[in-house]
């Protein structure tokens, strides 16, 4: 999995799949570290930390998150999992964010179908309860390999834009799309995905309107919509973090 995902740490599938992707990787790395008494640990690797902090960076506010591809538009993730991940990679950002997601509630570990994750969550409830709730992130977050860019300003504007290509994980034909939020309220939205059916993962996936470029914040050029495939991609995608500038050629 580490060799499959991009080194920049972004999750193409979005925050709603993060718990099954980077979150599950964290579980396995924790088992590996615990089983070897810390002798084998990857938590110091910058890539692993970036994979964790993707959750706090993708959180717009008031429950809304960046939702490219099949991702849900709401849901910040499991606070206990985010806290444990943050503690392992020494990310104050993640630990504060986990407390922020609780919104004043007491941490509560549910006994789900993942015994390891449930037991680990039980062990950190008290620590999370003591953490300072805070959601702080840089004004610009740029994932150069995945080509995701998040920018915000002091006036409450948050822009999420992407380059990419049309054969990503849980792909939509959406190379070059963007979403805009004002004071955490979605203004220019990504419609996301409907209820999964057999068609969603079959040969007729791109007959579903939510998968088509026409229903993203993208132009139809000369009556032609974007097509599915590795070769249909954005090019010359750049982000100037200092000047808060993002550009991509579709």
Residue ranges and their predicted role:
Residues 20-188, 239-241:
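Carbohydrate-active enzyme catalytic cores, enriched for enzymes
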Residues 9, 146-147, 192:
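Glycine-centered flexibility sites
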Residues 158-240:
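Catalytic core of carbohydrate-active enzymes
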Residues 5, 33-36, 223, 227:
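Alpha-helix capping/termination and helix-coil
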Residues 166, 245-250:
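Acidic, contiguous internal or C-terminal segments within carbohydrate-active enzymes
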Residues 1-14, 27, 126-133:
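Active-site lining segments of carbohydrate-active enzymes
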């Amino acid at each position: 999995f580490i060799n499959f995902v991009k080194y920049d740490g972004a999750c193409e599938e979005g925050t709603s799949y993060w718990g099954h992707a980077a979150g599950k990787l964290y579980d396995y790395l924790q088992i590996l570290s615990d089983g070897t008494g810390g002798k084998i640990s990857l938590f110091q690797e910058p890539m692993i930390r970036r994979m964790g902090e993707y959750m706090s960076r993708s959180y717009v506010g008031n429950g809304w998150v960046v939702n490219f591809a099949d991702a849900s538009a709401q849901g910040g993730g499991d606070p206990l999992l985010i806290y444990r991940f943050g503690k392992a990679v020494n990310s104050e950002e993640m630990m504060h964010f986990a407390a922020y997601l609780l919104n004043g509630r007491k941490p509560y570990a549910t006994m789900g179908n993942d015994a390891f994750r449930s037991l680990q969550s039980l062990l950190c409830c008290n620590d999370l309860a003591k953490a300072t709730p805070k959601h702080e992130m840089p004004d610009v977050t740029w994932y150069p390999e995945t080509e995701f860019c998040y920018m915000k300003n002091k006036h409450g504007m948050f822009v999420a834009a992407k380059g990419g290509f049309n054969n990503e994980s849980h792909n939509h034909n959406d190379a070059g799309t963007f979403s805009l939020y004002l004071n955490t309220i979605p203004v220019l939205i990504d419609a996301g995905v409907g209820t999964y059916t057999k068609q969603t993962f079959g040969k007729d996936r791109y007959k579903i309107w939510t998968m088509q470029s026409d229903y993203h914040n993208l132009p139809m050029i000369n009556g032609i919509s974007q097509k599915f495939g590795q070769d249909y991609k954005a090019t010359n995608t750049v982000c100037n973090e200092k000047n808060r500038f993002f550009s991509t050629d579709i």
